[in-house]
């Protein structure tokens, strides 16, 4: 489902410590995170917090490098980016019992040379603006960043 009249968000990835980013965060299926496209041009999907007001959360796209075997937990890095809300009419139609889900979409442009080459698992982190509750969940999707020439 194409995001309705939304522009592709310019990527602004930041490298962070996985341990610090997910400190006090709970992996929870109440954060429904889905990626529909993770191709060479864009990452597109949606995320919805079930049972809470979605307007109260800041959301971040999180990329987990797959090649972290042998690294200590404290040394593991992830790539994060604040995602801007994109209108998704079908979320509102299909989840009428959930609050403020229409802006649950995201569509981020892929640009080469912003990430190190490798395979990445894609997840979403949601932070409540008032209580600072942190929820995260994987999307079950992966993407590959090719070597830069």
Positions of PLM-derived features:
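Basic, ligand-binding patches in group-transfer machinery
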Residues: 1-149
């Amino acid at each position: 489902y194409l995001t309705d009249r939304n522009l592709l968000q310019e990527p602004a990835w930041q490298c962070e410590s996985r341990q610090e980013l997910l400190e006090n965060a709970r992996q929870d299926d109440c954060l429904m995170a889905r990626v529909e496209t993770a191709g060479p041009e864009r990452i597109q999907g949606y995320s919805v917090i079930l049972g809470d007001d979605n307007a109260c959360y800041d959301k971040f796209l999180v990329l987990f490098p797959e090649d972290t075997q042998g690294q200590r937990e404290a040394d593991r890095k992830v790539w994060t980016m604040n995602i801007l809300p994109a209108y998704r009419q079908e979320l509102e139609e299909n989840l009428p019992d959930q609050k403020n889900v229409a802006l649950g979409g995201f569509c981020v442009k892929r640009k080469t040379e912003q990430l190190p080459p490798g395979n990445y698992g894609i997840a979403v982190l949601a932070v409540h603006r008032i209580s600072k509750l942190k929820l995260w969940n994987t999307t079950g999707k992966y993407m590959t960043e090719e070597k830069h020439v």
